[in-house]
Amino acid sequence: MDRAAKNGLESSAKEIPALNRDVFPGPVSAAMMEELGRYVIADLYPFVVDLARCEGMWLGTVDGRRIFDWAGYYASKLIGHNHPGLYEPEYVQRLVRAANNKTPNPDFLTAECLEYYRTIHRIAPRCMRNPKLEVYTVNSGAEAVENMMKYLINLFHLRRGGKSASAQPGRFLYFQQAFHGRTIFALNVTETLDPVATKDFHGFIPGNLQVPFPGVNTSESPEKNRSRTREVLETVDWLLTRFAGEVAGIIVEPIQGAGGHRVAEPEFFQDLSRLAHKHQVFLGFDEVQTAGGPTGEIFMVDQLDLPYPPQAVATAKKFGVGVIYMLHPMEDKGVLDSTWGGGLVDMVRFVQEMKIVEREGLVAVARTKGERLAAGLRGLAERHPELVFNVRGQGLYQGFSLTNSALRLRLEEVALQEEALLLMGAGVDSIRLRPNLSTMDGDIDLLLELLERCLRRL
């Protein structure tokens, strides 16, 4: 029986690793990284992955070391490395065939592409399901968001009369510290803490409206969090009134990832949905990072109890390619188009991975595993209040803050160099945990033990 089917009762680790006195990178990794530096300027992790040595939650390196991975390739890993289900002969044959024959999707339709479309349509956000629901695939998360915005602009244009529409400007409303991608439309609804990504592009498309994101701070009182939420909603209401008829759409993440693992109250999203409906503004959710099941549902939007369905949801990462869900089809054909429309080999792999996820019931247990993880993190915060606070999240996507940015950077360094534990930062002072769905209870317990050891060294 595969380990992931054992109800999460043990860890994929053979044993708790001893202190890693040999710092990364190892000599083989260092040589390979040095060679890459001749070809491209890249900000690399200090190791080179050996895919054959990876297993479950563990990365293997070309130097023969093992790293406990809680970054999940920037939240793009759906199931554990080298799962036995990914070596079934019939699947491997389909995968190789797709890899050897890259086709433009879906224009040159294949059975493999159709199966992907059938799968993503079947698992669509429940709140959006209707006979007219349409899906479209592109190559990345940024392209998914970009095309979602094009879809909303198209709806906005048609609502204003199509060809006879006035020249009145159009805008998007978005939130502080949002990250939606690195294409031009997406960058103009993005506010990164590192200005390098946006400095030459932000504002290139003028007129967009930025408002605060009411991130919950679990270290503060419920009333203070509710007050923050009310203030933001009042601002949104005022802006939609002030710029009536000009706002094409609202773009929002259920959890702000790069912006600091920021989580809002469900009531915020519910009232945002009501405001969008009241002002006849289209609402689009960026689930590039959250979709796939780690929050306890395939789509986190289904956990928000929205009074009105969003017009669109964009996703990618764990889905292999970029996907746009549209509540209703576009009237203007050809607005969304791409040569490749996503990679066929990624489509084939995702279909197989989703079969594994459903067979092993991994989404259903993500909530209970998330409760175990959150409880353990709260315990760390109670034991180390001078270091850790504001534990928050949904399902397995949990995070916490350090009391200053220097501590966060130090924790990441100590974790990797001394415990072979890979963590991922978020915002200025936070850590976001992004495990794959094959994570077991033992993996969670091991993470908490390693974090305890790291915090004692700070």
Regions found by a protein language model. Name each.
Residues 2-458:
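Conserved N-terminal phosphate-binding loop of PLP-dependent enzymes in the Aspartate aminotransferase
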